[in-house]
Amino acid sequence: MRKVQLLLACLVFSVAAFAADKVIKLPKPNLNRTGTVMKALSERHSTREFASKALNLSDLSDLLWAANGINRSDSGKRTAPSALNKQDVDVYVVLPEGSYLYDAKNHQLNLIAEGDYRGAVAGGQAFVISAPVSLVLVSDLSRFGDTKNAHTQLMG
């Protein structure tokens, strides 16, 4: 049993060390983009067809910053609120070449796994697989600590 645990620990550390070299540093978000919230909302619609070209790094940077970036560097607070300010939501970026975790503090993507996992996160919807990027938002409930107490606080 100890050998298995040691082997797993070595594997985790080697994967972490390998992934540390696989970072995409994002450009600073463009806070001067034109357009209004009302225009964006009025033009919002669903589609089942996606352009085959990749999203450029600047657009991806802006999208990630808007979704969960840090907009108050003095406090580390985000563009999106979170319950009890636990910052429980992580954004994963799934691209044809690999899956990445968005690191808001350093505004970069950290490789989690190489390979195309868009089909795995498509939820059985074949048309989603052709999208050049998928964003997966995951809530890490462990950040609330004592979940019974956190649930009581959240639900009143």
Please give the residue ranges for each predicted region.
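Positively charged n-region of N-terminal signal peptides that target proteins for export
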Residues: 1-4
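Hydrophobic h-region of N-terminal signal peptides that target proteins for export
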Residues: 10-19
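N-terminal amphipathic, basic helical "cap/leader" segment at the start of enzyme domains
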Residues: 20-131
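Glycine-rich, acidic and aromatic/proline-enriched surface loops and short helix-turn segments
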Residues: 137-142
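Short acidic/His/Gly/Ser-rich catalytic and metal-binding motifs that mark active-site loops
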Residues: 143-147
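Short pre-catalytic strand/loop immediately N-terminal to key active-site residues, enriched for Gly-Thr
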Residues: 149-156
